[in-house]
UniProtKB/Swiss-Prot annotation:
Keywords: Acetylation, Apoptosis, Cytoplasm, Cytoskeleton, Metal-binding, Microtubule, Phosphoprotein, Tumor suppressor, Zinc, Zinc-finger. Interacts directly with activated HRAS; a RASSF5-STK4/MST1 complex probably associates with activated HRAS. Interacts with KRAS. Probably interacts with Ras-like GTPases RRAS, MRAS, RAP1B, RAP2A and RALA. Interacts with RRAS2. Can self-associate. Interacts with RSSF1 isoform A. The RSSF1 isoform A-RSSF5 heterodimer probably mediates the association of RSSF1 with HRAS. Isoform 2 interacts with activated RAP1A and ITGAL/LFA-1. Binds STK4/MST1, inhibiting STK4/MST1 autoactivation. Residues 274-364 form the Ras-associating domain. This is Ras association domain-containing protein 5.
């Protein structure tokens, strides 16, 4: 015998989930109302345990009748505060919690085991007397005032006490690879002749109209879209190319992350974040392009180049030369730290065969006598006087020998016919 299904509204069975039928009736009678937001009373309400006892059923029916199946009205909630742009991506750290690792640190790889470790081998050091005044140690970066050691092969210069700390091998062990120019230098013609050029006479500064005419003429001859731009205040900007001809090693910080866009904009000095240093040889005749102003001096150009390569050596260790090709010869002239390279570029034109800039070691720097004490200066005078007396004695001995040979020849010729 089939059991007839109960009609809507009848309860022939003792259902315990009594809140559901009213919602079911509401769905049949009209559109379903949205459920009320949970409030504190509903969150703290603990449901009674299920029971089939008649007393429990009657008590539950009485409580439902007293409530009248009325639900409390929803409490007015405060509107959500709108988030500022980029705030949802921000992570909050507990005070004192360790700072997470920089995402760029995942690119730092350990040293390749296939690369052999250098131990400072292959150098042939000899004592050096700096002819042009004090020099710079390639290991510690400090100034060398008196005695120094220099490798006869790679020109590595250091203090005598720094000799045992060198870990960079001599570059001559690599064969002729050190003498080959970099790929960027294949477009330039190199010569082996170096001729000193006399200092040019100072000229009067050009007027604004002359500068404008020279810039227009320069831009018409420039074919690489690297022209100069004139500002309203009379200054102008442009590009120069600097050839790096450094035979001695340079010192850079070790174990730092690459420079980011933020560091470049904020001019963050990453070299100051670590005390670790390492040395290496730059490729010969590498070319670096700089965008400078007409007010940029040679000293600022050198500092900009060192900053681009993250070199921590003293800028006085380097010097900027201008190289001129003329009649198959290469004329080098050291520029003063107050010279304006962009103005020289404007006068010579965009052709690098006429004028080019070279960064080399400052081996012929002027002696800063103010850096020495009185006893040291007196010692220098004593050494110079001794060297002068030695030279005089050598010249005297040389001509004394000539006199003796002439006198012997005259004695032998006496008594002999014609």
């Amino acid at each position: 015998m089939a059991m007839a299904s109960p009609a809507i509204g009848q309860r022939p069975y003792p259902l315990l989930l009594d809140p559901e039928p009213p919602r079911y009736l509401q769905s049949l009678s009209g559109p379903e109302l949205p459920p009320p937001p949970p409030d504190r009373s509903s969150r703290l309400c603990v449901p009674a345990p299920l029971s089939t006892a008649p007393g429990a059923r009657e008590g539950r029916s009485a409580r439902r009748a007293a409530r009248g199946n009325l639900e409390p009205p929803p409490r007015a909630s405060r509107p959500a505060r709108p988030l500022r742009p980029g705030l949802q991506q921000r992570l909050r750290r507990r005070p004192g919690a360790p700072r997470p690792r920089d995402v760029r640190s995942i690119f730092e790889q350990p040293q390749d085991p296939r690369v052999p470790a250098e131990r400072g081998e292959g150098h042939c050091f000899a004592e050096l007397v700096l002819p042009g005044g004090p020099g710079w140690c390639d290991l510690c970066g400090r100034e060398v005032l008196r005695q120094a050691l220099r490798c006869t092969n790679c020109k590595f210069t250091c203090h005598p006490e720094c000799r045992s700390l060198i870990q960079l091998d001599c570059s001559q062990q690599e064969g002729l690879s050190r003498d080959r120019p970099s790929p960027e230098s294949t477009l330039t013609v190199t010569f082996s002749q170096n001729v000193c050029k006399p200092v040019e006479e100072t000229q009067r500064p050009p007027t604004l109209q002359e500068i404008k005419q020279k810039i227009d003429s320069y831009n018409t001859r420039e074919k690489n879209c690297l022209g100069m731009k004139l500002s309203e205040d009379g200054t102008y900007t442009g590009f120069i190319k600097v050839h790096l001809k450094l035979r001695r090693p340079v010192t850079v910080p070790a174990g730092i992350r690459p420079q980011s866009i933020y560091d470049a904009i904020k001019e963050v000095n990453l070299a100051a974040t670590t005390d670790k240093r390492t040395s290496f040889y730059l490729p010969l005749d590498a070319i670096k392009q700089l965008h400078i102003s007409s007010t940029t001096t040679v000293s600022e150009v050198i500092q900009g180049l060192l900053k681009k390569f993250m070199v921590v050596d003293n800028p006085q260790k380097f010097a900027l030369f201008k190289r001129i090709h003329k009649d198959g010869q290469v004329l080098f002239q050291k520029l003063s730290i107050a010279d304006r390279p962009l103005y020289l570029r404007l006068l010579a034109g965009p052709d690098t065969e006429v004028l080019s800039f070279v960064l080399k070691e400052n081996e012929t720097g002027e002696v800063e006598w103010d850096a020495f004490s009185i006893p040291e200066l007196q010692n220098f005078l004593t050494i110079l006087e001794k060297e002068e007396q030695d030279k005089i004695q050598q010249v005297q001995k040389k001509y004394d020998k000539f006199r003796q040979k002439l006198e012997e020849a005259l004695r032998e010729s006496q008594g002999k016919p014609g």
